[in-house]
Amino acid sequence: MTIVVGYVPTPEGEAALTAALAEARLREQPLHIVNSARGDSLIDSRFVQERGVEELRTRLDASGVVYEIDQKVRGHEASEEVVEAADRVNASLIVIGLRRRTPTGKLITGSQAQRILLDANCPVLAVKADT
C-alpha cells in the first residue's frame, strides 16, 4: 500500500506533503507525490518546475521515505489525477491540503478537494496550512 499526496508549491501543498511524510513514516509505506497541470497555459504556478523538483527530491531524500514523484500535463483536473494515481498504486490514504474559499468561489470554480473526497476509493486526510 502507498500514501498518495496531491502536491502544489503553496502553503497548503507544503502542509499536505508534511502530513503525508508523517503518515508514510508511521505506516512504513512509500509516498506517491502527484503534481499535475492541465496544460492550458504556458506558466502554471501549481506545476513544480525543474528547480522545485530538485529541491523536493532533496527534502524527500533526507526524509528516508521511499517516494515517487508523478508529474503530468495532460488536460485533466488535479482531482482526477490524484484519484487515478491512488487507484493505480492501491493507496491506503490520500493526503490533500485545503485553502479557505468563499461560497461564491466554490460555486464558480468547483472544489478539487471536494471531488477527491467524493471520488476516492480510500480514506482522505485533509489538512490546512498554518496561518
Predicted segment positions?
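Short, flexible loop segments at boundaries between secondary-structure elements
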Residues: 122-131
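Small/aliphatic-rich secondary-structure junction motif
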Residues: 1-50, 59-68
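Charged helix-capping and loop-helix junction motifs
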Residues: 48-52, 84, 108-113
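Conserved acidic residues
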Residues: 1, 92, 121
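Short secondary-structure boundary segments
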Residues: 35-36, 93, 97-99, 128-129
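Glycine-rich, Arg-bearing micro-motifs that act as flexible, cationic patches
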Residues: 96-119
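Structural beta-alpha unit
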Residues: 62-94
